[in-house]
């Protein structure tokens, strides 16, 4: 779609450059009966007429008949402004916090006994991981500065991660975890 938009933009700029000094010629109309000869000449003039309409639309977009009858498309600037407004409420440190949380989980997994050492199946390993992560959770401190909500988000993300790991363990069934996964 972006390529299509780019080609339309290129075509518009190209036509503006070519027809900047050109004068529009009136469209020739015939009156009287339509004969095969006049029909052939009419079909030959269609590309010229379309070119003239396109040139008129480009040179005078507010006064052409096409722009008066068709709705104007939204401007890309408006879309960009709306996107910036939507993204204004997003925490910019979100990716950094998620990266740190991921490494914390990996460290917790490394501290758990491996399957060869413990001789347990993957359900018990996931249960140990869930127990370990639930034991290490602390209640977020409430502060008058409003930082409690960001801590709530962090702990919420960790609890979601715990649920995902628990679901993975349940869906795996009797499959064994290998160290290559971690």
Curated annotation (Swiss-Prot):
Tissue: Testis-specific. Expressed in zygotene and pachytene spermatocytes, round spermatids, elongating spermatids and spermatozoa (at protein level). Testis-specific.
Basic and acidic residues bias spans: 112-140
Gene Ontology biological process: cell adhesion; negative regulation of cell adhesion; single fertilization
Signal peptide: 1-24
Keywords: Cytoplasmic vesicle, Fertilization, Glycoprotein, Secreted, Signal
GO CC terms of this entry: acrosomal lumen; acrosomal vesicle; extracellular region
The UniProt record lists the keyword GTP-binding: no
Domain of life: Eukaryota
Pfam family, one: SPACA7
UniProt name for this protein: Sperm acrosome-associated protein 7
Species for this entry: Mus musculus
